[in-house]
């Protein structure tokens, strides 16, 4: 349920809430927007030791909450910074003893859903200008994207590792990466209950009052909310 105290751009939890309800929870360090990545982005200009020290502090905190249910997450894509982050995570894992997993950063349940969404999202920028970070050379096919954000099996994960590590020119320990892929399998099959991604579209069912069309009522509540927020900011 919604709680305004746990909302920052999207629903979230803080460390206190995680600590309170951590029993049985398995956490990974996430993608280039994750907690280890935060250390990387904030400290990379200061050098390797600054990044690692921040990651040590994060690791100590997460392990104190989750124990062996905290994992360093490696990902395989064409983003150069991902491979820099991977190297830092591997170093922290060797130093602290946390286990590693390899993932696809699965934002979408199927390749088809990913394909449709990624192309729609990027080509959509053409009609309304682009943010500064977006390359002028917008992709026209999924082959031009630098990642595949959907679940893969073990063989596909290994193929992604080989492909993207070669493109990045980064030498990894094959045995270590293989173990991280196998660890993902162990979590999926041995540590959690079975579930299957549900890609059905779910839209909220809004009751439109009598005398309004859906568009009219949306316009009304949007206007009322805007004026309410403006008053709060006075």
Predicted regions and their residues:
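Phosphodiester-processing cores and adjacent nucleic acid-binding clamps
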Residues: 1-234
């Amino acid at each position: 349920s919604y709680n305004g105290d746990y909302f920052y751009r999207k629903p979230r939890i803080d460390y206190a809430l995680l600590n309170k309800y951590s029993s049985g929870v398995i956490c990974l360090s996430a993608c280039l927007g994750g907690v280890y990545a935060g250390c990387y982005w904030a400290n990379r200009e200061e050098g390797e030791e600054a990044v690692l020290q921040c990651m040590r502090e994060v690791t100590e905190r997460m392990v104190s909450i989750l124990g062996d249910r905290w994992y360093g997450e490696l990902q395989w894509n064409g983003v150069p910074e991902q491979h820099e982050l991977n190297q830092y995570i591997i170093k922290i894992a060797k130093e602290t003893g946390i286990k590693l997993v390899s993932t696809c950063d699965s934002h979408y349940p199927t390749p088809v859903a990913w394909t449709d969404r990624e192309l729609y999202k990027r080509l959509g920028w053409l009609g309304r200008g682009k943010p500064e970070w977006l390359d002028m050379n917008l992709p026209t096919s999924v082959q031009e994207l630098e990642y595949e954000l959907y679940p893969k099996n073990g063989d596909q994960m290994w193929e992604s590792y080989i492909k993207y590590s070669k493109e990045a020119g980064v030498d990894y320990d094959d045995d270590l990466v293989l173990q991280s892929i196998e660890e993902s399998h162990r979590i999926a099959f041995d540590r959690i209950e079975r579930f299957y991604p549900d890609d059905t579209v779910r839209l909220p069912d809004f009751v439109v009052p009598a005398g309004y069309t859906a568009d009219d009522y949306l316009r009304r509540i949007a206007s009322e909310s805007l004026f309410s927020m403006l008053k709060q900011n006075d």
